[in-house]
Curated annotation (Swiss-Prot):
It catalyses: tRNA(Asn) + L-asparagine + ATP = L-asparaginyl-tRNA(Asn) + AMP + diphosphate + H(+). Its EC number is 6.1.1.22. This is Asparagine--tRNA ligase. Belongs to the class-II aminoacyl-tRNA synthetase family. It is found in: Cytoplasm. It comes from Lactobacillus johnsonii (strain CNCM I-12250 / La1 / NCC 533). The keyword Cytoplasm applies. The gene is asnS.
Amino acid sequence: MTELISIKDSSKHVDQEVKMHVWLTDKRSSGKIIFLQLRDGTAFFQGVIRKNDVSEEVFEAAKSLRQEASFYITGTVHEDKRSHFGYEIQISDLEIVSNNEGYPIGNKEHGVDFLLDNRHLWLRSKRPFAIMQIRNTMFKATVDFFEKEGFIKFDAPIFMHSAPEGTTQLFHVEYFNNDAYLSQSGQLYGEAGAMAYGKIFTFGPTFRAEESKGRRHMTEFWMMEPEMAWMHQDESLDIQERYLAYMVKQVLENNEYELKILGRDPEKLRPTTEGNFTRLSYDDAIKMLQEAGRDIKWGDDFGAPDEGYISEQFDRPVFIVNYPTTIKPFYMKKNPDNPKEYLCADVIAPEGYGEIFGGSEREGNYEILKQQIEEAGLNLEDYQWYLDLRKFGGVPHSGFGMGFERTIAWICKLDHIREAIPFPRLINRMQP
């Protein structure tokens, strides 16, 4: 019996007869030969039908195929060194499952809005396919890395009673007779998990009501947030470096085909796998920008152009450490050597992509954290449970958060973050 295989496994079946279920992405004919561009969700490759090698019925069926028709094929796999994939199939038989007219996305240039309106279909095309395969590798690498490091997956709630960072960029939800908000971060609940289980990571959707149309912003995005008990900031930076190096290495090892589809130069990513990220102080980053003629002073936060400039000075991610307390959230621990700054760090991705990680050592002292909550103008009652984490068995602890789509955008070298998620939610878009 002929074996049913995926396109991705073609290399294991060279010169063998196999069966596949596929969709048609494009077709061209030169009289007695029909060339079919095929996909099956694992890869794209070419099928060839020669009139002299198949029945009249099969050849006519192939001629009738329309874009995104679905069908079974039987044929023999051969090497094809001209293609990105490296293999093709000589088709001897096919069985049509569905074959309808009117597929809206033709093999021509389409506008961004048109493709977003048809995102449910555009996902089938080569570019989003490659991005989502890389996204999947990054997800698997994340789980593998943290399990090996002794972390457990910990699930934080989506509904929040209050804002984790005291911001106003919140989506309000009516929660029966109470007010609730969609989560901007699972961090505070992650800290509770760390005090129970030592080392945890949360991974899920977060929401931010930012009225921004910038290429690095969405209203719904995914965050990966580890929290680690008994750990100081320097140790946290070591973990961040190892994690990012491991994740990029997994993409390079498992997604060579997808990187080729995207035209992404893997050599631009390779330095990251070596680690050795520079740890640049906020003070030195300000000096670097000032020397470049930028209008910025100590105490200012970095804008996207500032982060972009800094990132272009390095061939791999860089840590910017110890920001002023005035521009970071209340829960961070102050630097014992300089109480005007926090023990915190952002990871800036190279090639102008800016911040992808943010983290800090958390303030572990009950009285100091209570004071910082009050100084931030937050309702102390809302954070009493959070203070309890320090009151009962509080220890030094640290954590960080990774913007998943921002990291994907850098690794895939995307122009806009909306490409990094299957169905982007933007200020002007909630469908499909």
